[in-house]
Regions:
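Conserved glycine-rich cofactor-binding loop
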Residues: 10-11
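Conserved glycine-rich Rossmann-like NAD(P)H-binding loop of the short-chain dehydrogenase/reductase
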Residues: 24-40
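Conserved NAD(P)H cofactor-binding loop of Rossmann-fold oxidoreductase domains
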Residues: 82-88
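Short alpha-helical oligomerization interface
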Residues: 89-102
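Active-site helix of classical SDR
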Residues: 112, 148
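Residue(s) in the substrate-gating loop at a strand-loop-helix junction
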Residues: 132
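C-terminal helical subdomain
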Residues: 174, 186-224
Length: 238
């Protein structure tokens, strides 16, 4: 029975993945800050679901929690980093930006490094992260969020290079959603908003295929290509 740990599983994509995987032959460990919601998810099947309360901005406590959770489950084969945050911040208030940086950059890096080292010692494993198509270009209304997702995309490419050169069976998957119908989707006039259940289904499929990069939904790949091709002079006027 494969063992999966999902970071940030109290709501949205993380919770959806935990619920879907619990219907199959997996042991699932979940983390989050809100214990009542973790208990709610685990109530679905207490024999297959385990939880550990964890705030990923506390880097030392996070590693301790992950080690405890891994011991409870008897190992880990797949690590999925879903935890993330971001705010619209056209006023450039640092108080709004700091939680994004602590979660999406510091917390993410701490967990990704721990997971990769764990898989190196185990000589196998699969590291998955939920980044965003927002990491493709900068954003005047959410500068820290887009920059943090660009960091995650670049960091995962570095780990993918490291995994490719490794003698071990280590895989990495960078999931890049567009707009998904969760609390993270902010702003007016959002388009191509993907329902959570559809996003979860596509993410699960990408993980099973060990895809290096997957766009959710698939059409966002073409939007990303267009954004990359746009000259800065045009993009900055959008």
């Amino acid at each position: 029975m494969k063992k999966i740990i999902i970071i940030g599983a109290t709501s949205g994509i993380g919770r959806g993945l935990a619920e879907v995987y619990s219907q199959e032959d997996y042991l699932i460990g979940i983390t989050g800050r809100r214990e009542n919601l973790l208990e709610e998810v685990c109530a679905r099947d207490k024999d297959k679901l385990f939880y550990q309360v964890c705030d990923i901005t506390d880097t030392q406590a996070t590693i301790s929690s992950l080690e405890t959770l891994t011991q409870k489950m008897g190992g880990m084969d797949i690590l999925i980093i879903c935890a993330g945050t971001g705010e619209l911040n056209p006023e450039l208030s640092y108080q709004s930006e700091e939680p994004t940086l602590l979660t999406n950059v510091i917390g993410f890096t701490n967990i990704a490094d721990w997971g990769f080292r764990y898989f190196e010692q185990q000589k196998s494993g699969h590291l998955v992260t939920i980044s965003s198509v927002g990491g493709t270009r900068g954003s005047g209304i959410a500068p820290a969020y887009n920059a943090s997702k660009a960091y995650q995309i670049n960091y995962m490419e570095g780990l993918r290079q490291k995994a490719t050169k490794s003698p071990y069976s280590i895989y990495t998957t960078d999931i890049r959603p567009g707009f998904v119908d969760t609390a993270m989707a902010k702003g007016e006039g959002l388009f191509w908003v993907t329902p959570v259940d559809k996003a979860v289904k596509q993410i699960k499929k990408a993980i099973s295929k060990k895809k290096k990069v997957a766009f959710i939904s698939k059409r966002w790949r073409y939007v990303t290509i267009l954004f990359r091709l746009l000259p800065s002079a045009i993009y900055c006027r959008m």
